[in-house]
C-alpha cells in the first residue's frame, strides 16, 4: 500500500482564510518534507492564510507533516539547490525577508489560527509544523504521539510540534509523548507561551528552544522524559514546571537570527545567541540518582524579592513582552 495524494484538505492558493475544519478523520497522505526554506506541505493546512480553526479531528498517517501552518512556494522553494549554495542561516533569513516584502507576512493577513482538541499520530516528520504561518496562533488541547516513530527518513524538522517564528503563539494543555522530540521552537520564539503541557517518553528531548532571543514563557508544564530541555536561546522565563530529566544549555555564536518589534512581524534586528538572560522561578527539579555525577554550577538562576501586595505593579504576576529581546522582563 502506498500513499500518492499530497494532501487531504488544502486550499489550492494562499489567502483563503477563516475556514473551520471540525470532526473529520484525515489520514493517508504523502506531503513532501517541509523545511522552512521551501513550500511547507502537510496533510491539512491553511496554506498561508489567516484565522483557520482546525478542531476535533483525528489526523494520522502522513508521510511528513500532519498539520502544516507553514510557508507557501512564493517565499522560496528548495533554495538549497544550485552550484554555489548559501548556508542555511542565510537562506532562512532571505525567506523571512521575502515573506515580509512580497509574501504578505503580516498579522492582518497570515496566522492567528486555532488548532485544538485534535488527535495527531503516526506522522513521520511532525504532528504540527510551520514557519511564520503559525504566528499569533493558539495550539491547545491536542494529543500528539508516535511522531517519527517508524524512522522512515530523518531530518532537522522532526518533533511533535515544530514551529519557526511562533510570535505571540500560545501552546497550552497539550499531551505530547512517544515522539522523537516533543516541542521544538526554532528561531523567533518571541512573546511565545508554553503552558500546562505534559511531555513524556520523548526520545531526544521534551523541549528544544533554538536560536531564539525571547522573551518567551514556559510555565506549569510537566517534563517527564529522560532529557527535558535543550536550551540554545536566551530571554526565557521558566516558572512552576516539573523537570524530571536533564538539561543542556549552550550558546550559539555562529548564527545570527532576527528579533521583532513587539507583537508584529517587522524585524527589529539580528543577533547571535550569547546565552543567559533566563529566569527560573518556583520549579521542581528531580535528580536522576546517578551517584557518579558531579554537581554542575548553575549561574543563571535569579530570584527577585517579593513585593507586598499593596505595592505590586500592574504587570506583577504576568509576563511583560512589550520590549525588544534584550529588554526582556518577567515578574512572577
Predicted regions and their residues:
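Catalytic cores of enzyme domains
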Residues: 54
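Extended acidic/polar, glycine-enriched regions
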Residues: 1-23, 27-31, 50, 64
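Glycine- and acidic/polar-rich repeat regions and solenoidal domains
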Residues: 9, 31-47, 60-332
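P-loop NTPase nucleotide-binding module
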Residues: 57
